[in-house]
């Protein structure tokens, strides 16, 4: 079980686009998530976005770097960023992504 939440206890079913970057030394990196029309922004939702929680059997990875995108005053997307300050944090994130990706049909593709 690997899932993403924006409010504790409320799974986000929309699968995001994810872009990864890492320094040449591998010491630091980041993951940028883009959710187009996530359910947390739907008309029926009343839950507050408190961060982005990546949850699996190892625990959770949390970021508060979460922004909403609005078009003509209507919420359309969420962008979130996770920062990695060590190779161990990167490795932990990649283990989460392997689980999340296999459950949601995501594939890892290196850029050219």
UniProtKB/Swiss-Prot annotation:
One of its GO terms (biological process) is photosynthesis. InterPro entries: Psb28_c1_sf, PSII_Psb28_class-1. Pfam families: Psb28. It is a peripheral membrane protein. Keywords: Membrane, Photosynthesis, Photosystem II, Thylakoid. It is found in: Cellular thylakoid membrane. Belongs to the Psb28 family. NCBIfam families: PS_II_psb28 (TIGR03047). This is Photosystem II reaction center Psb28 protein. It comes from Microcystis aeruginosa (strain NIES-843 / IAM M-2473). The gene is psb28.
